[in-house]
């Protein structure tokens, strides 16, 4: 398995919509394994395929450090909110180093998709896992969490980005 480079803010792949996965083959299994290694190496709780430069609809997550939390992957994810209750909390992104901001997400979502073999999977998630599902699916739609911020938070986040060493290389 391999730790891949995480694409950083400004890379066009991060604002591109990922393609539905139709081939459940060894290359998909390798991608998922590499994504787990990459996420763990970077210290993240989630990673979407386009964050490693691959436009395929798959993400991995690890919320196992939270009571009852899960670790897994989802191919071709689709989610819908359960109820209207929301949660607001600090959110960051491996593709936008040093930036975190208060972001509002649905508290509980129903997720469906497939596993690496094409088998259907589904779950209901709340809290951190719900936030992770929404964040990673946004990535697969080419949407960064900055777009979910209110204008003042977005302006502050962009100021941090513009002042960052990684942005000014």
Swiss-Prot record:
It holds the Pfam family Pep_deformylase. Binds 1 Fe(2+) ion. Its cofactor is Fe(2+). Its EC number is 3.5.1.88. It catalyses: N-terminal N-formyl-L-methionyl-[peptide] + H2O = N-terminal L-methionyl-[peptide] + formate. GO terms for biological process: co-translational protein modification; translation. The active site is at 136. InterPro entries: Peptide_deformylase, Peptide_deformylase_sf. Keywords: Hydrolase, Iron, Metal-binding, Protein biosynthesis. Fe cation binds at residues 93, 135, 139. SUPFAM superfamilies: Peptide deformylase. It comes from the Bacteria. GO terms for molecular function: metal ion binding; peptide deformylase activity. Belongs to the polypeptide deformylase family. Removes the formyl group from the N-terminal Met of newly synthesized proteins. Requires at least a dipeptide for an efficient rate of reaction. N-terminal L-methionine is a prerequisite for activity but the enzyme has broad specificity at other positions. This is Peptide deformylase 1. It comes from Corynebacterium efficiens (strain DSM 44549 / YS-314 / AJ 12310 / JCM 11189 / NBRC 100395).
């Amino acid at each position: 398995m391999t730790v891949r480079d995480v694409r950083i803010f400004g890379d066009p792949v991060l604002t591109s919509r990922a393609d539905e996965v139709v081939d459940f083959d060894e290359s998909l299994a390798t991608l998922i394994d590499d994504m787990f290694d990459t996420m763990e190496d970077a210290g993240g709780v989630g990673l979407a395929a386009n964050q490693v430069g691959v436009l395929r609809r798959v993400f991995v997550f690890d919320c196992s450090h939270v009571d009852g939390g899960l670790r897994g992957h989802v191919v071709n994810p689709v989610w819908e909110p359960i109820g209207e209750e929301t949660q607001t909390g600090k959110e960051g992104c491996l593709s936008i180093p040093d930036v975190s901001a208060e972001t509002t997400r649905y508290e509980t979502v129903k997720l469906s998709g497939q596993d690496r073999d094409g088998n259907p999977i589904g779950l209901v998630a709340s809290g951190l896992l719900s936030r992770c599902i929404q964040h990673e699916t946004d990535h697969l739609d080419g949407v960064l969490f900055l777009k979910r911020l209110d204008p003042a938070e977005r302006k502050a986040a962009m100021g941090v980005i513009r002042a960052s060493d990684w942005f000014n290389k």
